[in-house]
A protein has these predicted regions:
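Sec-dependent signal peptide recognition
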Residues: 1-7
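Intrinsically disordered, low-complexity segments enriched in small/polar residues
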Residues: 17-66, 75-115
């Protein structure tokens, strides 16, 4: 009976979240806003209509919790002008070949925002 209970708990336990980070380097002369979007769910980081703001010529480490194996894409745009954007853009609707990463425990991915 105990084995059945343990087996049921193992099956019912959701996948543990992975903690990873994105190291964002803003090489632009303007401040930029950045959001991270899951391609496997409706999750957005930081969420709640907020953004990660990176000052001009600055860098920031952005820690997140995600589901291992989840595909995460970044979108960035000049603060105050979302017509100048990179990655998947502010609405997560732009094509992009190199702006997505796989959620992996204890990993750090680098995003370079250039002119």
């Amino acid at each position: 009976m105990i084995r059945l209970t343990l087996a049921a708990l193992l099956v019912a336990t959701p996948a543990a979240a992975a903690d990873m980070a994105f190291f964002v380097k803003n090489l632009r002369a303007q401040g930029v806003a950045v959001e991270l979007f899951s391609r496997d769910s409706d999750k957005v980081w930081p969420g709640g209509n907020k953004v990660f703001f990176i000052r001009p010529k600055a860098q920031k480490s952005v820690p997140i919790s995600c589901t291992p194996g989840e595909r995460i894409c970044w979108g960035a745009w000049v603060d105050g002008n979302d017509q100048i954007s990179a990655g998947v853009g502010p609405d997560n609707d732009q094509p992009c070949d190199n702006c997505c990463f796989i959620c992996t425990e204890h990993s750090t991915e680098t995003i370079d925002l250039v002119q």
